[in-house]
């Protein structure tokens, strides 16, 4: 059996959330008892908690919702590239060493340990010119082990607007702590949330061959 790497953080009331966004909450609506045969809970959360796929609707009014996105970009060969010392922005030179025969999907590890239990504004993001460069190589999906491909303080979301213009899909909040650089199969399908600006994904990598 081919090896799998689960690159999704756990989702719970401890999950970090962008300041002002909706945290994870769960309450039990029904509970097992002599009168009730099942447990059923109600969950409220932002679709940007945990590993998730942003939809164009997140950064453009009237654009495509998460559940209406084609699934092909979220499934197939991908490359994991380490850029652990990149600083606040991932630049093309941080990835150029791994650019030969680039597959259509690229995930970048920027942190020694992904922040799965705490929020921090101090994370790495993609420089817009890096996304332009990746698009020129035929990349259709980018991913990162931080909450956003733009800096936390950005009000213009320049990198998000590049992926909108270039029709590139994006995965955020991945956990790549135990994944070595190299090529894998990515499986990270968004849910069919046909009105949503993003969707949780259960992102996994599978060895090739």
UniProtKB/Swiss-Prot annotation:
Its cofactor is Zn(2+). Zn(2+) 1 binds at residues 48, 52, 54, 172. It comes from the Bacteria. The active site is at 58 (proton donor/acceptor). Binds 2 zinc ions per subunit. Its EC number is 3.5.1.9. Zn(2+) 2 binds at residues 54, 160, 172. One of its GO terms (molecular function) is zinc ion binding. GO terms for biological process: anthranilate metabolic process; L-tryptophan catabolic process to kynurenine. It is an enzyme of class 3 (hydrolase). The keyword Zinc applies. Pathway: Amino-acid degradation; L-tryptophan degradation via kynurenine pathway; L-kynurenine from L-tryptophan: step 2/2. Substrate binds at residue 18. The keyword Zinc applies. Catalyzes the hydrolysis of N-formyl-L-kynurenine to L-kynurenine, the second step in the kynurenine pathway of tryptophan degradation. NCBIfam families: trp_arylform. Homodimer. This is Kynurenine formamidase.
């Amino acid at each position: 059996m081919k090896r799998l790497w689960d690159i999704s953080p756990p989702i719970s009331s401890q999950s970090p959330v962008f300041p002002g966004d909706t945290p994870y909450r769960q309450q039990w609506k029904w509970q097992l008892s002599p009168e009730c045969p099942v447990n059923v809970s109600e969950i409220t959360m932002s679709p940007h908690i945990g590993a998730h796929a942003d939809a164009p609707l997140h950064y453009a009014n009237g654009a495509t919702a998460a559940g209406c996105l084609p699934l092909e970009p979220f499934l197939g060969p991908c490359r994991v590239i380490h850029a652990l010392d990149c600083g606040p922005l991932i630049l093309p030179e941080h990835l150029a060493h791994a650019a030969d025969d680039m597959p259509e999907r690229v995930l970048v590890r920027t942190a020694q340990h992904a922040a799965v239990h705490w929020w921090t504004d101090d994370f790495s993001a993609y420089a817009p010119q890096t996304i332009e460069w990746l698009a020129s190589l035929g990349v259709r999906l980018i991913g990162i082990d931080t909450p956003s491909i733009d800096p936390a303080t950005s009000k213009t979301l320049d990198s998000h607007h590049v992926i909108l213009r270039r029709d590139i899909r994006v995965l955020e909040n991945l956990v790549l702590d135990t994944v070595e650089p190299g090529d894998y199969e990515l499986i990270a399908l968004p849910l069919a949330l046909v009105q949503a600006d993003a969707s949780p994904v259960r992102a996994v990598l599978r060895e090739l061959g």
